[in-house]
Amino acid sequence: NFLKFTEWPPGTTSDEIVLCTSKGNTFEELDAISGKIAQSKPVRIKRISSNDSTNDCQLLFLAREEGPERIRQWLTLIGNKPILVVSNINGFLDLGGMIALMNDGRNLYFEVDLARVRQANLKLSAQLLQIAREVRSR
């Protein structure tokens, strides 16, 4: 649902929304999103390595299996590009990420670093921010 509640700068999306993930990612739930519609556009999953271009990615999902060091490398590579970066690794916001997916054993929830989102010139809907467990704005 992050794709539905994110606004990208003009000219950064084409006729589809591209959700990128690292090639080593085994988070199979992402495959179920492929072909779904978000913001009236089909969603395509693209598996990439750090050597691949991220220019057509609107969202980059980094699985916890990447580990903190590798995730820091990805975040450096992305910089302030208008790409929403999401991960399920503990401490993702402290690493410099935008949205951290969390599971406390009973519930799934998420936390947002709004300052990082804004640095990338992205906007998240008020609806999405209201249901976040934590919103950091530094």
PLM features: residue spans?
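Short hydrophobic alpha-helices and adjacent helix-cap/hinge residues
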Residues: 2-138
